[in-house]
Amino acid sequence: MGRSWGLALAAGERAGCVVSARGAERPGAEAEGPWSCSGVLLSRRAGLVLCHGGIVAPFLSAGAAALQPGAGPPFLGADSCRDDMRLHVQWGPGRGVGARAGRRGALCTPPCSARPAPRGQARARLLLLVCCPAFRASFARLFSGEAAEHWRFAGGGPEPQEPEADAGAGADEGPLLAALGWFALLSVEGRAEAAGGPWLSVAAAASLPKGAPLLACGSPFGAFCPDIFLNSLSRGVLSNAAGPLLLTDARCLPGTEGAGVFSADGALVALVAAPLCWRAREWVGLSLLCAADALLRAAAPALGRLGRHADARLLAALLPPDGGEPAAPLPELGAALVAAVLIECGSVWGSGVALAPHLVLTCRHVAPREAARVLVRPAIPKSSPVWGKVVFATQDTSPYDVAVLKLEEDLRGVPFPILASRFHEGEDVQVVGFGAFGQTCGPSVTSGILSAVVEGLSPATLETTAQGPPILT
């Protein structure tokens, strides 16, 4: 992508950690757990860690029902959990920018062998279990649609026991879903490091535009084999946002719940709330994030109400200033975000791109030849939908999945893209389309590369999970 990631890499390595929870051993009974997830060291010196609240849910005295919306206050103290809960935190060496790995061994030694081993586990105690109410409100708005559109999420605690017939059909209403939006603030006993460097800087999520580059630093599979997986990196972009609920196409795996997501300049933007999600049993290639600034704004006053005023002041000091300007669209994406349109054809909907004031290009399976009329909704705020009809569509047997719509009225204020004439394997591309969320929060942005270019032979296929959107270089 032609940019330097040094600051983000250093911040992620310095802040990344793994948190594990298990029950104490009792005579005649096996200990519960262990469960683990990723976390963020807000400061090694202060020993404060944020992680996903799902691993604490099994130890709640009132059960996971205490995390359900409307069940009680949006925060719980340490006394809400059983006394037999044991928490541990493991972190890496946290080399800074420009630091070099130690001398390698033989010439064939892989580069990862020069990486210092993770530190041993340190005991930690729970200070606060806090929910971000704004995140939960945005979550309810995005994911509480028609009953037929079942959503399922992975990550955030122990998997619920489900009947096989219900698997993947939205039956995930147990502790896993209840814990979405809940995060745990821990204190590491003995502090993480006596000279642990500066606190993290926290970015205002609203200041980042769609398409802004992001770097996720987490540990896939949690505490399983940290020598290999601790603080693994995944690069992506900010795909969309609904308040403090952010979506990214950075690839996150189970175990990265609670991982930090950083901007290119090394500021903490968000924590992973759910690494994987499905709609109607189809995987949606986006991860759910909770904005760090919104989470800290909820956690700081909650600590104060629990009498932990010193810790509350520490969190408040991390917050970015209020009242920042809304993010302006990225220059390379501004026109595409407006040129993308939502197309509704009966019960089917997809994306398209405006090529002229009265012409829209989309996929045949979105608007088939037999469709009498289709509704086109521009992405421009407060613009009116326009009716159109299919004037061209490839045959069902054709390898090309293309349809052209002629509109009854011209699209106003929509910039039209310049068509590319040359293509290069490996070049960066971005897709702007309405994806799985329709018009709820506008078009989404995903990033990738042009994997192959086929000329004069068979056409290439690109899977984007957003049928019909423009692909930009």
Model region roles, listed by residue range:
Residues 40-41, 249-272, 353, 450, ...:
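Catalytic nucleophile loop of clan PA
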Residues 11, 16, 33, 56, ...:
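Serine endopeptidase catalytic core focused on the charge-relay Asp
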Residues 1-35, 303-347:
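Protease-domain processing segments flanking chymotrypsin-fold serine proteases, especially trypsin-like
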Residues 1-76:
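Conserved, well-structured beta-alpha core segment at the onset of a catalytic domain
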Residues 37, 202-203, 247, 328, ...:
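A structural connector/turn signal
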Residues 25-53, 258, 338-357, 363, ...:
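A conserved glycine-rich beta-strand in the N-terminal activation segment of trypsin-fold
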Residues 262-325, 333:
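C-terminal subregion of chymotrypsin/trypsin-like serine protease catalytic domains
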Residues 44-47, 211, 261-269, 358, ...:
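A glycine-centered beta-loop-beta connector
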